[in-house]
């Protein structure tokens, strides 16, 4: 549903710019017409991305996050999202149900995010926090341990943050300790 809405929004935006492009060309403003044409190309790239993701349901973003203030140093969440902005999912998880926002250790696109996530879950199965409900994707592991397994599965990672920033937690602790 989110992707359908995104596609409809992009198509509406493209139609608007195509109409404007015609009007600008009628006025003979080729410089502005080129700018509008570039915007249309960017929108078409966005539409192609949505179409690709709709056709490839295994594609998505794998994330590794932690919440030092809520769960301590040795608990991570390993999940996947197909959201257009994967940080929306991370922000959603850090809503009012936990005292601090989650820190992102890894967040990357994969053509087969389903398999990458499943393999990570398999490798950490004996460290699953909730052994009754497997949809709860929390594991007793450090970010460094997850990184080690992720490199074996995925290869080189563009970015991985081992030490959580935990800005609000650390600031809160400093106030408590003072």
Where are these regions (language model features)?
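Non-catalytic accessory segments flanking enzymatic or RNA/DNA-binding domains
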Residues: 1-178
């Amino acid at each position: 549903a989110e992707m359908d809405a995104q596609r409809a929004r992009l198509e509406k935006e493209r139609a608007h710019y195509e109409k404007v492009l015609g009007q600008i060309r009628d006025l003979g403003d080729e410089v502005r017409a080129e700018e509008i044409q570039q915007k249309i190309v960017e929108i078409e790239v966005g539409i192609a991305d949505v179409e690709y993701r709709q056709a490839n349901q295994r594609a998505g973003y794998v994330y590794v996050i932690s919440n030092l203030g809520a769960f301590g140093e040795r608990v991570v969440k390993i999940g996947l999202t197909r959201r257009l902005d994967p940080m929306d999912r991370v922000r959603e998880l850090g809503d009012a149900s936990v005292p601090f926002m989650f820190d992102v250790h890894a967040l990357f696109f994969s053509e087969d995010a389903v398999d990458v996530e499943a393999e990570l879950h398999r490798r950490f199965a004996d460290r699953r926090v909730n052994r009754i409900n497997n949809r709860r994707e929390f594991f007793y592991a450090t970010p460094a341990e997850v990184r080690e397994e992720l490199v074996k599965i995925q290869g080189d990672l563009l970015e991985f943050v081992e030490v959580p920033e935990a800005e609000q937690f650390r600031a809160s602790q400093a106030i408590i300790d003072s």
